[in-house]
Amino acid sequence: MVAEDAPVRGTCRVLFRTTTLLFLCTLLSLSISILYESLITQNQIMSQAGSTGSNSGLGSITDLLNNILSVANQIIYNSAVALPLQLDTLESTLLTAFKSLQTSDKLEQNCSWGAALINDNRYINGINQFYFSIAEGRNLTLGPLLNILSFIPTATTPEGCTRIPSFSLTKTHWCYTHNVILNGCQDHVSSNQFVSMGIIEPTSAGFPSFRTLKTLYLSDGVNRKSCSISTVPGGCMMYCFVSTQPERDDYFSAAPPEQRIIIMYYNDTIVERIINPPGVLDVWATLNPGTGSGVYYLGWVLFPIYGGVIKDTSLWNSQANKYFIPQMVAALCSQNQATQVQNAKSSYYSSWFGNRMIQSGILACPLQQDLTNECLVLPFSNDQVLMGAEGRLYMYGDSVYYYQRSNSWWPMTMLYKVTITFTNGQPSAISAQNVPTQQVPRPGTGDCSATNRCPGFCLTGVYADAWLLTNPSSTSTFGSEATFTGSYLNTATQRINPTMYIANNTQIISSQQFGSSGQEAAYGHTTCFRDTGSVMVYCIYIIELSSSLLGQFQIVPFIRQVTLS
């Protein structure tokens, strides 16, 4: 698939839905017109011929209206329910057919193996979904670790370091990237970037394995940092920024660092562009990828972002006096309401980072090769999210969700449902609805440890995203009972004791610590999927683990089955 063909499906859906809406509006107008004429006719008949004739005329008009409404209802059902389901089924059928038609590995001698970039049929329909009902979510447990071949390369010297993983999975394939530092773990001087793509296949033991089909090693002297990756049709898109100074210095800068988009296709086409999104220069002192993965949505690739906003700019002023306090805080914080509000308002501004406002948002880029000025920056409203931080975007069916790292004072897992508004075919605004939870805490320093429950200024924590196993919208009150899984560092203040868990809003349901007590670790990424053949749900937990042999950190993928007990 070439880059120009990528948005075709989304465009066709938009055209179909637009045409359907216009047709329905026409039917509605005709119905109103007929009803209006019928009322006039009824009055004329009653004044001239009495009630007997009017009843007959009115009955025929009522029958006509019923017929029109019946047709309209059928059109609404077909366009809103039946056709989307048929399109989804057709897509899955085509993917399955492509997979079965891929070149066989039993080829003539000296010919290459022509694997298609499509996951095994068992997984195509089991990706990016909610896998359990609310009731089932109360009875989930973690299975044992499964022994898979790692698709993530590691350092090969004691001085090397691999850090900041980003992983994205769709129906067709997966994409992965991490930073490679040759000496130490500081990435602001010199580093390289590893990128790979591949597919999920079953092993002879029945559980899944991740097969790498393409790799790219960016070692060209450009210090790309904090890269986020997203699967796109036919390949991967990666968003990075370029800097050779410490993070704090980025926030003190007058202009944001260089922003780059890299597109890598399965056919070995590689495109890299320096992008200049409008509204960034003179507004953002620094703009950073969220490191967690992005998503492909309606022809646009969306990436999580955060950074420092310059004082007295339009964005700064639009966020004045806005603050967000998670729902669970009211019952857990001993501060009075006025103190909570004041502390929450001030938590977005950091003297350590040059008195910038620390802001989260989304970078939206159309899937095309000329991206210099086409990407858009969409900030979240700060009365809906906490202080800006690293993050990740997810697709569950047709819904977009967002994870925000708990850098700020609230130490619990922060997940949001995102609504994206489109204007003239472009994303123009975003809003976020928090999934309320008082689990699972991250470690932090000082007054910002895992035990903190009250608003205040914090700049701490660690990236530890989570995967929703149940749909927060399935309850009458959004998110009142949601179950999710991930990995966290089970301590109040230190980055130690990596633990995989299943939790709901109020408690950890099941957990398994990896390694001995005191094992050092850092970032954690979690993605789940279903084997539709066996109906089993698997989760991959990608965790940065410290190593005493090779490098300060190694990135390790762990696979577990989530079982319904």
From Swiss-Prot:
Major localization class: virion
Disulfide bonds: 161-185, 175-236, 227-240, 333-454, 365-375, 448-458, 528-539
GO molecular function: exo-alpha-sialidase activity; host cell surface receptor binding
A single GO cellular-component term on record: host cell plasma membrane
Protein's name in the database: Hemagglutinin-neuraminidase
Positions of region (Involved in neuraminidase activity): 223-228
Signal peptide: none
Catalysed reactions, semicolon-separated: Hydrolysis of alpha-(2->3)-, alpha-(2->6)-, alpha-(2->8)- glycosidic linkages of terminal sialic acid residues in oligosaccharides, glycoproteins, glycolipids, colominic acid and synthetic substrates
Compartments it resides in: Virion membrane; Host cell membrane
The species this protein was found in: Parainfluenza virus 5 (isolate Human/LN)
Gene Ontology biological process terms, A to Z: symbiont entry into host cell; virion attachment to host cell
Glycosylated residues (UniProt): 110, 139, 267, 504
Lineage of source species: Viruses, Riboviria, Orthornavirae, Negarnaviricota, Haploviricotina
Any one Pfam family match given in the protein's UniProt record, by short name: HN
Enzyme nomenclature, EC number: 3.2.1.18
